[in-house]
Amino acid sequence: LTLREALELANGTLVWESLSPTEQALVAELSPAVDSGQGSDIGFALPEGQTTIALTALLPEILVPGLTLDGTTQAGYDPNLMLDPRFPAPPVVTLTVAPGYEVARGLTIAASDVTVRGFTMHGFRTAHRATQTTPPTNIFISAQAPAVDSEPNLPPLAVFRLTEPEAAPRNVVIEQNWLGLTAEETLPDQPSAFGVVVFNGVDTVIRHNRMEFHDGSAVITGHRAEGLHIHENAIIGNGLAGMPDAIRLEGQIAASEITGNLICANDGSGVFLFKPDGSTQIRDNQIQFNGRRFQRSAVYLMGSDHQVTNNTIGYQPGAGITVAAYPASHRNLLRSNQFAQLDGLSIDLIAQGNTGVRDFQTGDGPNPPRNSRHRRLDTGNGSVNAPEFETYRFAATNGTALVTGTADPGTELDLYHVLELGLPYGALGEYLGTVQADEAGQFAATLELPVGSRVSALATDPAHGTSEPAAVAILTAADGSFPTLPPPAPSLPDCSPPSPLPPPVFEERPPEPLVLELSRNIHFGLDRSEISPESAAILDNIAATMLEYPFLTVELHGHTDPRASAAYNMALSERRALAARDYLLRQGVAPERMRIVPFGLTQRRSQDSSRLAYARDRRVEFIFTDLRGLEIIFIDQEADLQLE
């Protein structure tokens, strides 16, 4: 049987009697299971070396409850290769699109209690049209999936039963799949647009999946996703050319949870909540090295009553957690999280109804103390005041220091050890404990930390939420002096799965400066973003160097010549940087080691207007950083200049 025939047979649109005797032998009736309410099982016994199912058209919607599609039944699947639940064993069965065809969705689920397990899926996308299609994705969940394209004879909206919660598929489970990447763990030639779209589903479970290299988000919700559980997935390197956020929640999301995931190296936020109805819990996740293409907060919250707790959040070109001012966002509890290496506050509450572009991406910086009751209405989390220390230098005696200050009366103060250098704010590194502010707003805490340590605090008011952090205070010796403690050792960008081999032991010796004869730029044709053969050779050399030296990271700066508008050139420079990044991805360079920065026409090589000067302007520059803090010597090249 083909997969299409198996789905039709399960749905009842293909009858058993119409099958050939050979095909009938592949179908067995599970009477006890049917009596217990369980539906059909679809297993796989594909010939060795022929385990890729390439579609030329949409598969039938899954309409029968209780169906299980189990790719782990295919010979060759080894569950022992799963060393971490977030990195499932490599599936053997691949579901993709045949070359030269466009298929919008891999699987469309319109029934309850459906399980999809053990597949590799990629290639599901649609070309841009005058009227855009409904979301193309690996897996689409809805009571009745809308048509891919808009047509004059489409049924009315009521047919989709969006206003009937009981019609939504319930308890759909997506587990142990590789979504977006190939079986060889590489970027596909044709990436999928999205990973999983929960358009209209209740109590959906997405767990133990590896989700990488989608043009858009790995998980996105639509009209209804109440009770959604996203648990222990590896969500890496998504948003390459579209919606940049790893997880984007919209619509009805009450009682949803995002727990235990590795959310790493995505192009935007790790989690972005856009005008949701209901609240979610985000806890116990590693959210790091995101914002590869956009300067966004690691977690961006709209709405009220969300809880963000016990997460590790860091290495973000923006704030750690941002709470919007509009729509009204209150009572969001943001506690026991650990932050590192942020280009912004650990927690940023958008103030005074600010709705600029930056306010919906990364935050607006520290807020002044609340000066009016109106701030309760127009600022995130009711404008809970950040704590203020009585002084910003506290003397430590015998290894302890009494830290005092003020906050909103009755709030709970979470104190943090700030491990990084810099004033007046720093990432909240190590949680130290909690104290209570009295009715006058006074608080005190005894801390056991060495002289030179830096501390900060957050205030949480259950009626309004958690505040922004306090400015940093330093623990000093009795005479007011303090040493400058060394910052934490740099962390190499790493989103890779665990290795079964022990880590190599290196001889400890002072690193020597690198002297590399490595080109740091490539050039493009007029109004083009394709990689030329000459530029490809240069990129091959860059990729080989980055694979050899894992402590190198790179920013890809896109540039254009000055012709055309600033907006057009900004988009063109981004396309050029993306083309270079995608080429390096296909050569095996990890996405967490690269970041896109488009400059448009703002940084020309010279002010000349000759053909040669314009050719030099049309470039991507590679700005390398040695995470050991050493200088690197690079060279420019012009071997791939393209004169118009």
What are these regions (language model features)?
Residues 1-168, 191, 314-316, 325, ...:
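N-terminal, post-signal-peptide segments of secreted/periplasmic proteins
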Residues 69, 115-116, 173-175, 204-207, ...:
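All-beta strand scaffolds that present successive hydrophobic residues in beta-strands
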Residues 559-632:
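Periplasmic OmpA-like peptidoglycan-binding domain that tethers envelope proteins to the cell wall
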Residues 451-463:
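Short, aromatic- and glycine-rich surface loops/edge beta-strands on solvent-exposed regions
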Residues 103-105, 125-132, 183-194, 215-221, ...:
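Short glycine/acidic-rich loop motifs that flank beta-strands on beta-rich extracellular proteins
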Residues 68-70, 412-416, 458, 555-557:
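Beta-strand signatures of extracellular beta-sandwich domains
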Residues 480-553, 625-644:
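Periplasmic peptidoglycan-binding/tethering modules of Gram-negative envelope proteins
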